[in-house]
Amino acid sequence: MRQLVDNRWFALADLLLVMMSAAAWMLIPLYGIGFSLIALLPWILRFLAGYLPFQRTPVDWLIAIFLVTACVGYWAAYDKSAAWVKVWLIVSAVLLYYALSAQPKQNLGFLSFLSFCFALALSLYFCLTYDFAGIGGRFGGWWTNHRPHVDWPAIHYGDVLGLILISAILAFYWLWNTTKKAFGSAAVVMQLFLISGMGMVALVFVLTVSRVIEVIGLFAVGLWVLWRVSILSATHVRVRAVFPSLVLIYLVILITVAYLGPASDDPASTHNNYGRNSRAELLERGGYFLLDYPITGAGLNSFPGLYSQYMIVIPFFYFSNSYNLFLDVAIEQGWIGGAAFLIICLAAIWLVSQRIVKDPSNEIRMANWLSLLALIVMIVHGLFYDYLYNGNGTALLFFPLGMAMMGVVNRNPTENGVIKSPKAFSQVNMAMITLPVLALILTFGVNINKVMSLWYANLGAVQMSQVELENFPTGQWATSEMAPRLEVAQSTLHAALQYDSHNQTANYRLGLISMLRQDFKTAAANLETAYQDVPNHRGIIKSLGYCYVWLGDIDKAQTLLDQIPEAQNEMKVYIWWWDTQGRPDLSENASRMTSRLDPSSQ
């Protein structure tokens, strides 16, 4: 049994089963569980052989915490069917992480080759599906009209850029070794494959890279500096000790420069009534959800509905994600899940950096360098595009991390034949668990009322979103018929105010519930309290402004609704809508407000 488990082909079979499981959840989710169970067979065989079921890594406990918060995120989600698929894609991502980290060094070349194939396949997919006519140019229009027609969904060019960068970096190991080999009679075929493949990947890279060219320049300069420092570390012990810290400092500088530039970019490509649509604006608005759902998270796949319903207050989807990998994780899985994922990424960079200056093998050092570059791209580019935690891309969430851990973990069995976790790994795990626990204990001890208020507000917000967003988007405003279904959420939110009367989350949502009941005086009181605490929250501004309209206080309403460009058109619709609801008085208020917002209509 141990001969089978120790064979390099067993590790590749493990990886193949995990890839099949992930593909099943993407293409045929009805049979996904069956494929996931099959993917666990290598774990069972390792256990029967006397080994641990999976390869131990320094971040195992954090991975476990991340998985637990993902399960909690499924419970909290308003769309259970979408959340069910996503939680299993996360499980597939974790299985991929352990399948990659367990690969022996002999398989590194084949894994790099798979990365090249993925980059090539993604490039072909992009060329066959993207609307090049929309970006102008004769060639783009010609290609869009004459290429083979495929009825596949297009992938955003920013997502393609990130995935190609990561996979191409990891593929470089195979490309480098392949160019030095002789293939005999197959040389011509292999050379054509390499040239055409690299040409296709390079073409797509050029087509998608224009907006971040200055960041790439800084990226290259920083890498050269780090490379020179790593050479010095061979003869200077102090340089070797501080090298991981230098890498993290470089990462911070790169993120700062990147966010000062591309953060102002417009992910929706057009400015409209709902704001600047910049990443900086999305980061600010998304941050409010971190305050609403700090403990459980808002639920898997919840950002689109939350942003539309509670931030811009419209009955249809606007953004599918926050264009920020780490923000999306923290929103959907809470502070604990978000912190766990961030620490995993930073720990991986630290550990790989250590291996670069400590590993004497040039071959393994090169693989570690490539892993480090892929991790840096994942983190920096993940601050601007979320393709690793959105849709089918979720299955690749731990792909760069798993490749990085290949050069970090120790796969040598002990004398008893059982793989044990190195002492250093245990110390890292203990520190990663102890510090957050101490922080939580300190938080509870300092202000228990604040914590209880956060808990009830979080729970009430989850209960409310599960009712209001059950069939979202409907394309229509909710009516008072929904109010009775929100009684449980209302009771929970009132409990939050008993511990902290200024809890913004509870006051905002209680105000929305009172508006549904058409109790506008109570709604105004709650919304005013919330507005005092967070005067820049767009959802609160809009809801309070509308509440003032229904109360007939047009002057106060105008002060707020002047900040909401779409209010003018929506008020015109409300003139008709309130009339159909049997409230001609509110229809008249909407008409008065329309005149204020659009003086030309008078």
Descriptions of predicted regions:
Residues 1-72, 78-82, 92-109, 113-117, ...:
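Transmembrane signal-anchor hairpin modules in multi-pass inner-membrane enzymes, especially those
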